[in-house]
């Protein structure tokens, strides 16, 4: 109901403030469009504070929202971004200020594009398409370089001129395509497929100059990004300037900051390589000369040794030593044989002297009984026992009496 007041019965400030608060609270949630001018994310707090300014009038509104709501928007929620928010307005009587508690934020224009690209980036990153482990090494000196760029563009000129300046014999397979607009993605995909099928092409450069976020959108297209990942040939992204970062930069095997930088990355500099070869030659010469000098000194040291001053002298000395040892060994051997021969003669004489046959030769006889036992005493036989008598000339029978 309307408030009534008179000069004599004015309404207190608190009454007006409470009435405004009650009326505003009945509005419910509303959609509000504005421009973000200030964001405050305080560490440890789940509430984010920001200011929303009217894009036409000089009017601003204090906004609060949960941190998760702001995080869901992504990097597009920055100062200057235009957004549409859904929230419930409230009036604080104590401060006399109007605020908006927001539960949803939707970016407009570039902010919406950035949010969509951020979601795609997160999806591809989760699939591992940005991982360094899947990046392929560029060939040192490619047989041919594939170049996908705009017709008669500055990017085309920069890549070709710098590549041929660095390596005059480089072969460029050029595919001119639309680099912005609705036809760009399909033409780039066709050119990529064509160059990837050419076995002579060992690296592909996708290049264009700088541009607005909308101009560079084809190079963040999901179909193109997945085609680059699936390509057999390494791909170099050379889109825009240093500050431009389309999603192609993340899936490409190498990201070049500019088209000129791409040319430097895909082919070596002939003058640098010539200087490197010459430096390696000089180093090889120095190493070889040092080794030869070292071996010469070693050979001179060997030749300076006394033994090499008269090499036959040592051989003669060794020959004399061998001759003396030979003579000594012959003398020792002859002496040993003589001693052994004398010992053998003495042993044979002793054997003959101690032999029973020698005793028999001296006229003795050996008497044995019938069992063959030697008779050493007459008591060992009886009269009539048969005996065998062995003399030097043989044996004969006898009988005891």
Swiss-Prot record:
What Pfam families does the annotation carry? Exonuc_VII_L, tRNA_anti_2
A GO-annotated cellular component: cytoplasm
Q: Which InterPro entries match?
A: Exonuc_VII_L, Exonuc_VII_lsu_C, OB-fold_nuc-bd_dom
> Which GO biological-process labels does this protein carry?
DNA catabolic process
- The species this protein was found in: Parafrankia sp. (strain EAN1pec)
Please state which protein family the record places this protein in.
Belongs to the XseA family.
From the record, give the cysteines joined by S-S bonds: none
Name the UniProt record assigns to this protein:
Exodeoxyribonuclease 7 large subunit
Domain of life where this protein originates: Bacteria
Subcellular location(s): the record lists:
Cytoplasm
Q: What is this enzyme's catalytic activity, as reactions?
A: Exonucleolytic cleavage in either 5'- to 3'- or 3'- to 5'-direction to yield nucleoside 5'-phosphates
Which top EC class is named for this enzyme in its record? hydrolase
UniProt entry tagged with the keyword Secreted: no
Q: Which UniProt keywords apply?
A: Cytoplasm, Exonuclease, Hydrolase, Nuclease
Query: What quaternary arrangement does the UniProt entry report?
Result: Heterooligomer composed of large and small subunits.
- Function according to Swiss-Prot or TrEMBL: Bidirectionally degrades single-stranded DNA into large acid-insoluble oligonucleotides, which are then degraded further into small acid-soluble oligonucleotides.
Gene Ontology terms, MF aspect: exodeoxyribonuclease VII activity; nucleic acid binding
**What does the record give as EC number?**
3.1.11.6
